[in-house]
Amino acid sequence: MATSVQTGKAKQLTLLGFFAITASMVMAVYEYPTFATSGFSLVFFLLLGGILWFIPVGLCAAEMATVDGWEEGGVFAWVSNTLGPRWGFAAISFGYLQIAIGFIPMLYFVLGALSYILKWPALNEDPITKTIAALIILWALALTQFGGTKYTARIAKVGFFAGILLPAFILIALAAIYLHSGAPVAIEMDSKTFFPDFSKVGTLVVFVAFILSYMGVEASATHVNEMSNPGRDYPLAMLLLMVAAICLSSVGGLSIAMVIPGNEINLSAGVMQTFTVLMSHVAPEIEWTVRVISALLLLGVLAEIASWIVGPSRGMYVTAQKNLLPAAFAKMNKNGVPVTLVISQLVITSIALIILTNTGGGNNMSFLIALALTVVIYLCAYFMLFIGYIVLVLKHPDLKRTFNIPGGKGVKLVVAIVGLLTSIMAFIVSFLPPDNIQGDSTDMYVELLVVSFLVVLALPFILYAVHDRKSKANTGVTLEPINSQNAPKGHFFLHPRARSPHYIVMNDKKH
């Protein structure tokens, strides 16, 4: 059976050090068009999600991650130790499954960029063409990862700087020039438009996109154990991360919202739409650079998808180690890649992609369903995280931990309940059709989302019920936790949701 090796960690991580290894989560260029559909109220949604959801998740996860004996294993360990192994298995499974669905909006973005580069609209509009192209890209990227992930983090680093950060700053700079020139702005930015129209329930659905942009912070909570002064520095780091996320996402989303009217934004290709308008206004003589920028964005998101393929499966591998999965899922190839877990995840992605793209028309509705489905699946894990934390506070107050949410038991419960209630609210509004989906499409939106969710929801519980956990997988694999001292180069440029929590050690070779 696989074993886990504990490694000592020097308490050397400072406030800025922790911020640096977590900051990659605040850049999500492919979500900017979705943000933009809410106009100036996107700032309100970002503040709401940051204060009522991001901060509670970060604080609760940090306290659980520093409980003696719970330092490794993440949400699986926390939920298993508070609610039981069945729920721990479900929680980590939902993290694994949400990545499978989360690939779909990213692939749609890639196809949107490709359609601009190749001047091939069908690639972004025709469902069959879109499906075939997305499947080819997905499995081609998977093949590059089966050979091992030695260079994955470095590729992700290059992709982050050249394909995410650089285009984002170009977008913001062009938008600033556009605004300064006195060009027409597609939205109003004042105190009235700051708040969404609460009388229109459909306008609230976009909140799920803002929740998604904050998801994954719990994956970095294990590094709290490495901080020299977690009680002081960790809450400040969370505040800095929230401010950075709000500032960058606000400016990025508004750069699109003020150029493209909300009802004309293409969620897959909205960034390229905006670059086209901005460049034609600011520097029409070099409008050809839009295709170059599109190529950078394409490479950035391709690098991101590639880097997300193996990491979550390695995280899920801990359940095979605990005999919660059939022995086949514990199999590794010679390069330390859990191929059965990776292939299973990609099969789920492929099936969902085919269904959503062809029944949803391959347009904004397909994108929105994939986005909402990703969120509701992941929220199921967060329900268990918050409930598990409440159990920890009420039933295990004497367990030693390095970090405590300040303020005592009452404050701890308030933080957890606020996070849980916000999660429930986000979960409910996810199933409401957005305003830009009208007529018969609203029924299709709800039906597709509900059925897809119920199928995915059932998977972990069915597998847990039918699997004989007495069988043992003899893999000869050792798991070595990754920390800030031994992490591979470029590891922290991966989004926290996509990072592998441990090395795979086989035959004395670390993967």
From Swiss-Prot:
Residues 1-14, 63-93, 149-157, 222-239, 313-335, 388-412, 467-511 are cytoplasmic. Its main location: membrane. Residues 36-41, 115-127, 179-200, 261-291, 357-366, 434-445 are periplasmic. GO terms for cellular component: plasma membrane. Shows pH-dependent activity. Keywords: Amino-acid transport, Antiport, Cell inner membrane, Cell membrane, Membrane, Transmembrane, Transmembrane helix, Transport, Virulence. It catalyses: 4-aminobutanoate(in) + L-glutamate(out) = 4-aminobutanoate(out) + L-glutamate(in). The keyword Cell inner membrane applies. The chain crosses the membrane at residues 15-35, 42-62, 94-114, 128-148, 158-178, 201-221, 240-260, 292-312, 336-356, 367-387, 413-433, 446-466. It is found in: Cell inner membrane. Pfam families: AA_permease_2. One of its GO terms (biological process) is amino acid transport. It comes from the Bacteria. It is a multi-pass membrane protein. One of its GO terms (molecular function) is antiporter activity. Belongs to the amino acid-polyamine-organocation (APC) superfamily. Glutamate:GABA antiporter (GGA) (TC 2.A.3.7) family. Involved in glutaminase-dependent acid resistance. Exchanges extracellular glutamate (Glu) for intracellular gamma-aminobutyric acid (GABA) under acidic conditions. The ability to survive the extremely acidic conditions of the stomach is essential for successful colonization of the host by commensal and pathogenic bacteria. This is Glutamate/gamma-aminobutyrate antiporter. It comes from Escherichia coli O6:H1 (strain CFT073 / ATCC 700928 / UPEC). The gene is gadC.
